[in-house]
A protein has these predicted regions:
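Histidine-centered catalytic/metal-coordination loop motif
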Residues: 13-77, 143-200, 213, 225-228
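Secondary-structure boundary elements
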Residues: 75-87, 129, 195-204
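Short terminal or interdomain "cap/linker" segment that borders an active site or interface and mediates
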Residues: 102-107, 125, 214-240
């Protein structure tokens, strides 16, 4: 776990999807499932992805009476580690679970013809344009940062929903690109984006959601909001 300071936000969570879950039934037969874990943002600790993967792997040769027993064990352990109740939902592959892939209902800004030369977070790039109050959703596939522990690249789609003065889209895209050489955890990057937008664009309402590509059978999808927008559903981004 890693201690983290969080913004005081009404609605936020980190949603993890796990695609490589397995354990043994009482007869020693392997069982497999997919899982969804919801970690509240007010937890005093965040769960580091590599250690989470090692924890999940520890189930591979452990016998359990049922999927419910596995779920209860994970919920107990993860809640104790995070310091707040962690939601756990497992689906056995034998139950034929389904998952949807889609794009946000919003405006993709990646095709803007911009010049980029900043590759560390540059919040001073953010600005608004003159105009009436708008409510819109902007998104980009160009968010890339690096894992704070391993230095490996983290790739994500980031979705920004807000109400307020129009955010300059070219400036926003340059800002997103500026994370390219930045070393920080997924959750911290999303919180940084949220706080920078709050400070420099001062929207009346704001939500920032990122869906990161999976590594080691896990993907992380942080969500930060002022409370004016609901938690998004678990629709996968195409690279997930």
């Amino acid at each position: 776990v890693t201690g983290v300071q969080t913004c005081a936000l009404p609605i936020c969570e980190d949603l993890w999807n796990a695609y490589e879950l397995s354990w043994l039934n009482p007869k020693g037969k392997p069982m497999v499932a997919v899982g969804c874990f919801r970690v509240p943002v007010d937890s005093p600790n965040l769960i580091e992805s590599k250690s989470f993967k090692l924890y999940l792997n520890s189930f591979n040769h452990t016998r359990f009476e049922s999927l419910e027993a596995v779920s209860a064990t994970m919920a107990r352990d993860l809640s104790a580690t995070a310091g707040r109740p962690v939601g756990v939902a497992l689906q056995a592959l034998s139950s034929s679970p389904t998952a949807s892939i889609g794009s946000p209902d919003g405006i993709l800004i990646d095709d803007l013809d911009i010049e980029c030369d900043r590759y560390q977070p540059a919040p001073e790039l953010l600005t608004t344009r003159p105009g009436d109050i708008v409510e819109e959703t902007l998104y980009s596939h160009l968010l890339k940062s690096n894992c704070l522990v391993t230095g490996q690249p983290d790739w994500a789609m980031v979705v920004i929903r807000y109400r307020g003065r129009p955010i300059d889209r070219a400036a926003l895209l340059r800002y997103i690109v500026s994370f390219r050489n930045h070393n920080e955890f997924h959750e911290q990057c999303v919180e940084r984006i949220f706080c920078d937008l709050q400070a420099h664009c001062q929207p009346q309402a704001l939500a920032v959601h990122a869906r990161y590509t999976r590594r080691g059978g896990l993907d992380i999808n942080p969500f930060r909001s002022t409370g004016d927008y609901p938690t998004p559903d678990n629709t996968r981004e195409i690279r997930q």
